[in-house]
Every structure is written in structure tokens, then in C-alpha cells.
Amino acid sequence: MVLFVLAFSARQALAEPLYWQAKKEDLTLTILGSVHVGDESMYPLPSAITDALKNSDGLVIETDIRKSDGVVYPHNKLTTADVLNEQQLQLLTDISKSLGMPTQQLLSSPPWATSLSIQMQQLKNLGYGSASGVDATLANKATTQDIPVISLEPLQFQIDLMTKQKDDGKEWLVSSLEEFDQTDRVVHCLIESWKAGDLAKLEAFSELSEMSPELEKAFLTDRNIDWANKLSANNWKLKSKGNYLIVVGTLHLIGEGNLIQLLEKKGFSVIQQSQSQPAQCQFEASPKG
């Protein structure tokens, strides 16, 4: 029994979240795939990551949500009640009751805001919070160590990304409602796959929710291209001779046209440094109605 426990512990110790080292001339980037929400089971992070932060010239994240001064939320024309059919309205009512959320308030909110509210409340009920997300945790750690925190894009850009979707975010809202029953299992497996660095499972997760080509282009493809251009530019915010820790959502680092591939095309030599294990969970594609 003791041998089994020791063997299991040793095997588990090998598993860690996905991270890479990218080098080009005198610039070294340690790139970690993040999950934007989390819980204490995701910590401590691998010592290679905390050491990379401690010895870095800066932490680069998607955006520093602590810098919210001057952020403007546009006036949306459509409410949630405007965009849902009768069946979807009933589904929203049932979901809001199960989460203890005010249905009328959700119905009068823009679709994107309703979707975000439902997702955050559901994650909170499952024990996950954005304050425990990997990027937020590392940003706070960087600040206490007097390490610069560098944003790839301003917070206003991310707000606009959410609020200026077609029909004020109807597609995102409908997906949130239809996938609500699976979220508990899916999020659990996502966190387990992230902790294990299970690339195959994370790719399966990315294929679970089929975004429209427009959303995929806006949320993933265009941003990956923009980030690769910035990280490889001589006139952006990075020193040409420096070490940086880059932390972006894991979905930006897997699949077609990911940031790793784009950096390689920009002349970076990239090596995966993390040791992975298969996660003990399964994603299943939801049946299409």
C-alpha cells in the first residue's frame, strides 16, 4: 500500500500545466497557458514558473483588469428579453432560479451581460473564482515583487470584444443557456486537464463549444496574430535582451493558428518544457439538438 501511494505521488508530481520556452536572439519568453478562473487545488504553480517570474524583466498578460480607470461600457440596444424565443426564455428563468439570481434583472440586461453573470455565478457556486485565476494570481505576485506587469491589450479592448458582438451577444448567451447543464462536469475536467497539462484533452475542450467563424476570428485568431506581432516587434514594450513570463489563456496556445505556431514563424525557437500526464476525466461532445 505504501509503495502504491509513493508511486502514485511520484507519477502525479510529473504532471504540470503546459508551458514553453521561446527564444529569439537575446529575448527569452516563458509561455504559460492560463485558466482565467481557479481554486486552491491549482497551486502552488511549478517552481519553473515562479522562478521565471522572479528572474524576469516583466510579466506579460492579456490585460491587467486592475487598471479599469476610464473604461466605458457602451449603451446596448437589445435586452436579453428581446433576443430569446419562448423556449430559451423558460430555460433562462429555470437557470436563474437555480442560481438564486433575479430573473427580471437578467431579462432587462444586454445578452452579453446576462451570459457573463450566469457563467460567473455558476463558477462561483462550483468553488471557482476569477481572483484565483492563474493570470490574476501571478499579476498580484509580480506586483508584490516589484516586477512590471505588461498588458498585451487594454481592458477597454476586452470590454468592446464582449459588448460589441452581433445582436449584443445573443450567440454567446444562447450557448451559455444550452450548455448550462454540462458546465459543472466540463469545468471540472478543464481544470483537471489544465493541471495535468493534457494537451489532447484541452484540444477536445476547445472543440466542445463550436463558435461561429466570426466569434472565433474575433476572440482567438485575430488576437493571436496581434500578440505574435507585438511579442516579436523591436518597438513594442519588451527589451530586446530580456526574460519575460507570458501568461495567456490556454486556448490561445493550442489548435490551428495558435500563438506558439505564430511565434515560430516569427523566428522564435520554441520548446515545450512542461511534463504532462493524461487527466482522469473525459469531455464528451454535446448532442446537437
Locations of regions flagged by a protein language model:
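Positively charged n-region of N-terminal signal peptides that target proteins for export
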Residues: 1-2, 246
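Cleavable N-terminal signal peptides
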Residues: 2-3, 13
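A cross-kingdom marker for long, charged
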Residues: 217-289
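Structured, acidic catalytic/metal-binding patches in enzyme active sites
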Residues: 16-19, 23-30, 35-219
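Short secondary-structure boundary/capping elements
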Residues: 14, 41, 223-227
